[in-house]
Amino acid sequence: MIVVCAGPIGNPAARLLALLTARGHQMVKGPEALPPGEEPVVLAISDGPSVFDYLAAVQRLGPHPFRTLMLSRLGAHPDARAASLQRLWRLEEHVRAGNAPVLTLRFAPLVGAETPLWRRLRSRPALPNGGRKLLNPVAERDAIETLDRAFDGRARWEGWYEVAGPEAVTLAELRDLATKAPFSGPPADTGEWEPALEEMMEHRLAESQPWASHFGIVPTPLGAWAGAATA
């Protein structure tokens, strides 16, 4: 599948899309970089300017049939305190109003061998509120598999889903899991908060089942994440 990135794409969306090239999908930076022809494409949208001209992006696709992928994050809401989550909500609404096939995925914090959050937690950072915040982190490999199944037609291109693990864990428990796992990366690699802490503090418990059912995913169990971090 050819995936066209519309405007700036921030992480984790950019990283997930880049990893999908290993599964045979082609990433294109902007409609102008598309090869000639009428091959179907996916128009990928994520973090960008507050004002995004969806119609203009669609028009630049020319004769290519397209579907739209909205790469969002948990917590996107018009009343969110974090400006980034408000912006994502506006993008979701803007895209939904375009009357084109749209699949919206709201990603939970991603955990895996190379995720910035996992590396950050390994550095034993201080945690807000004693690390009591409950999260539904999801294995990055499950997020990649979700996108792969959407691109190759194994899941219907419709609706919105919370891509989140079924197990609730506190931020402190997640840090403990990360620090106990074997690690072969650079000792000075402290990663980063992904998403930002201010976003995670707004997370409510997610609904994992609709996502898992729609995409035929068996979420990676919490206890397997330590193994995934060294795979």
Question: What is the meaning of each model-derived region?
Answer:
Residues 1-41, 172:
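N-terminal Rossmann/SDR dinucleotide-binding element
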Residues 6, 31-36, 40-98, 102-106:
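Conserved Rossmann-fold NAD(P)-dependent oxidoreductase catalytic core, especially the SDR/UDP-sugar
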Residues 10-22, 146-197, 202-231:
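Mid/C-terminal beta-alpha module of Rossmann-like enzyme folds, strongest
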Residues 25, 66, 100, 180, ...:
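Short glycine/serine/threonine/alanine-rich loop segments
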Residues 26, 30-32, 80, 132-133, ...:
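Generic anion/oxyanion-binding catalytic loop in active/binding sites
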